[in-house]
């Protein structure tokens, strides 16, 4: 069998912002040609309706670059029924790590206020614009148009912060020279043992393609209030309807994952002849923010730059609502790649079972986040016939029981004999919680296949609630900031969700922080 090297094409999209003059003509865009269902808002009772409520398009921009991805509600802080008049209502949106590489905020939480090397961001790299988008009824938001549905982008009043990134989340790092994973704790003196390749060390920390951003909504701001009323409240209602935190995040074994059908809905950026409208932070809104002297707003970067409507009108590619459902009705949802389909592609996916990828055994799965190289780790889903286009990175992957199985991040490419890569129809997702499973230990390694990657098999991990093998997970942030997700953990009887309350490493950090506060001397 011919073995092909495997790469992946990320599903986020980067656009160079066009320079525009005063005069312009709105482009006539072609209709996006695809077998998937597009630009159709799911009705109540539709299997895609829950994905629709939870999901948004994300848009980050610097002074020269525009980046798009897809995100979904994972958590929040505040009472949605009686929101505060002074403190912002905080929403937490999950997406991919490679999507939030576009978020570079000097007022972010540490260590995200600098790059991964501890250096200040360059002026051209700083995020100056952020907006949330959704394909919806424009009339709900006061947009005057004859269109019954449109892509509506709303600029929030402040630049988001980073709540969590799944980089360096396990005690393993990858040696680019030997193509093997090593335990970091086994390295006595990493600075001496690492080898320099070009300008970087041979060792790369592990990452999972998952991250969470914090978006503050100041409800005295018209645009933030629109986001809260028309985007966030329906998402919270659906989140709770699906069972809230305790029921929403699945932890299935690999055999159970193989049998699932996965429901996905996202926002790829493609040429699509739909109406698109932006609701920006106009001059009158920005002035209101500046004269409103709320101290809490000093903790955030308020947006002072906006996109004008003509920026969208002359843009050929627009975020477009897509479902992994065929127009003909031949299929609804995605199945994992079968062994037969994998053999037809002559592709080694480092898999343990049908359609399950082990990223630790594939050397081409790596990325740069905030100017540092990372190597992908953990388990993934190889989704047959799910090649969503750029902009769909971060799409939520729900199983048939309406539980969160993972997050979509790209499309597989295979290296051909002539040196060119061929894009496949296979989508890829990162599994968020990997159950302790005998199948992980039973897998036997093939020496022939090891030429394409490491012989190491990924360990169990849980990047939502944590476990003994996961040193960096989202519940740590949720506990520190007392979010809704942590309140659900506290009230739950499920012990597997409560690891954060018994994490020995976290307890050491908390005790050290208390000791530091107690030993502080105050000088008058």
From Swiss-Prot:
Lipidation sites (S-diacylglycerol cysteine): 22
Q: Which organism is it from?
A: Mycoplasma pneumoniae (strain ATCC 29342 / M129 / Subtype 1) (Mycoplasmoides pneumoniae)
Q: What is its main location?
A: membrane
Instruction: State whether keyword Manganese applies.
Output: no
The protein, known as: Uncharacterized lipoprotein MPN_084
Q: Do you know which SUPFAM superfamilies this protein is assigned to?
A: Trypsin-like serine proteases
Which residues bear N-palmitoyl cysteine-type lipidation? 22
- Point out the signal peptide segment: 1-21
Q: How does it sit in the membrane?
A: Lipid-anchor
Q: Which keywords accompany this UniProt record?
A: Cell membrane, Lipoprotein, Membrane, Palmitate, Signal
Family as reported in the entry's similarity comment? Belongs to the MG067/MG068/MG395 family.
User: Subcellular location, in the record's words?
Assistant: Cell membrane
Source domain of life is Bacteria
Kindly list the GO CC terms recorded for this protein: plasma membrane
